[in-house]
Amino acid sequence: MKVIKRDGRAVDYDREKIRIAIDKANQEVRPRERATKEEVKEIINYIEELGKKRILVEDIQDIIEEKLMEVQKYELAKKYIVYRYTRALVRKQNTTDESILGLIRNENKELAEENSNKNTMLASTQRDYIAGEVSRDLTKRMLLPEKISKAHEEGILHFHDADYFIQPIFNCCLIDIGNMLDNGTVMNGKMIESPKSFQVACTVTTQIIAAVASNQYGGQSVDMIHLGKYLRKSYNKFKKEIEEKYGDKLKSDIIEDLVQNRLKAELKAGVQTIQYKINTLMTTNGQSPFVTLFLHLEKDDPYIKENAMIIEEILRQRYQGIKNEAGVYVTPAFPKLVYVLDEFNSLKGGEYDYLTKLAVKCSAKRMYPDYISAKKMRENYEGNVFSPMGCRSFLSPWKDENGNYKFEGRFNQGVVSINLPQIGIIAEGDEEKFWKLLDERLELCKEALMCRHYALLGTHSDISPIHWQYGALARLKKGETIDKLLYGGYSTISLGYIGIYELTKLMKGVSQTEPEGHDFALKVMKHLNEATQRWKKETNIGFALYGTPAESLCYRFARIDKERFGTIKDVTDKGYYTNSYHVDVREKIDAFEKLKFESEFQNISTGGAISYIEIPNMSKNIDALESVVKFIYDNIQYAEFNTKSDYCHVCGFDGEIIINKDNEWECPNCGNKDHNKMSVVRRTCGYLGENFWNVGKTKEIKQRVLHL
């Protein structure tokens, strides 16, 4: 029999622990009130004869109290209750000392590998983690209802970002960068007026990105289409200067050449400013800003020519990469690039196909950009095309008072994820039991999400002026609350999920790619989506269904369930759970079949979803990759490529750093295993990671099969 402790761990049942607990209480009562050895034995026998495979520690304690009362040992029962209450108070005390000291001494491996873009050796990152540990502790002990904290500990659900929950800040957003650049903003009490050139616009954009990142915990996105007009301003400025200086001496075509040369230099410098500042800035979160640059063109845009130039330069610089400390060009993790495929650039003879060809070449070498099909996105979002917030979170369509769709300047309140495989384990193939338990746990998730919502309710705009007062999300008055932005679907709040593959395997015995598994998996997805739509109607809050990235959660849920339920083939034995609705990473399936199959699930998971294919080095077979991009445009909303982009600082090896049989990263050329002497970049879960991963995610990365 396994005993499930309060933190979700499963330990072997030990009758001696019951005997010791009762004996301790026995010592504090009068002799005639003590339980005899026979009475203690009867209590133990009763528990053991229940024949349970698993029992909660609280249930054992309840039984002990009940049995002591039955034999009229009231004083002893009272002492036992006091003992139990005292232990509960001890658990309520501060629990952060060991984890914080372990972090400072670099001994807290689990925390160090929680986020692959945070280097816990750095003092600045350690400060963020220390604050995060305090926040987690307060959240668990004081801020969340006990049943939500318990559900989190037992792996029933995951209350994301508890390390920031003590403050009224939110998850991710689409910055209203056009508004801020055109109308000005304020940072650190200083007025920033509308830029007069492209270079200044790029500098201001990076300053905004840093300020925004320091006042939220999730990703942010910037639509680069708003910078086209500033490149035009630079063009007009250069032309005026050169004409004033050389107008009577040079022909117009020579003047135009001079203008273009200066413009190209400014374009290169401006884009370089964005790329290098994002990769060298350190926010208060202890990492570079988690930012996505959205690269798209609109046919009726008066600055389409300039925006095409900006996209081309961004792609060229990303293809080149950024030099590491050894002076070698490597793949940067940020900014994430998302490139939009539309009718004029989908490699079907369109005017801007040349940009897509460059994007594909860049993806083959640097993994970014990822691709959004404008055609498929319009089908899912009422004819609109807009950026994900960060890596994969999508807003729901929303109209302002004039009936105009608005996406920029909106945000996500937070996420709670449900552990689907655990429900499948408990249901043991019984569908009636499964659906009943799923609904019970969905209600728990709703309650946890409402905790997120209530934490933001009543927040004053002064908490983050860059967000609420100076244009990133709104232009509220000082002291005004943000409440109106939390209702009516203006912002979203997300139900995440993980492990559709494992759940289907448990309930149907097959993968979701098999017909029986496919039907069941889709039914589950639709059920989850229906729950969010129902909650949305009940509360007037923008609930949405979101495919959880699960960088550390893929390991956490699997570890908890293995401890509680043992080793289960294709479920807990792997050391990780599969991301959202994705096909098992080990399953042999070709790129086109995988993308087509997963597109059906993306269309349901409209609050957030992304699909990937694993590819070898395609730098000498770009045509094949172009055929995949064409397929993406016609078949799936959002997709990305995973390849390898590594470098060994010891021997200069430029290729794939492998994961050896001991689950360690190792240079195949010289055997170097020192993380500090290698650059490894992998697709973590929608974005790239470069500071290594926890044991579960590392196993998942190792087991990924090629799809092309």
Task: Go through each PLM region and give its residues.
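Core of folded catalytic or high-affinity ligand/protein-binding domains
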Residues: 477-478, 485, 489, 495-496, ...
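Conserved catalytic cores of very large enzyme subunits
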Residues: 86-90, 96-489, 510, 514-680
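Long insertion/accessory domains within large nucleic-acid-processing enzymes
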Residues: 669-708
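Buried hydrophobic packing segments
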Residues: 18, 22, 227, 231, ...
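Contiguous, well-ordered alpha-helical segments that form the cores/surfaces of helical PPI scaffolds
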Residues: 493-506, 526, 683
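Short, solvent-exposed positions on alpha-helices
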Residues: 34, 55-58, 491, 515, ...
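Charged, amphipathic alpha-helical regulatory modules used
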Residues: 1-107, 702-707
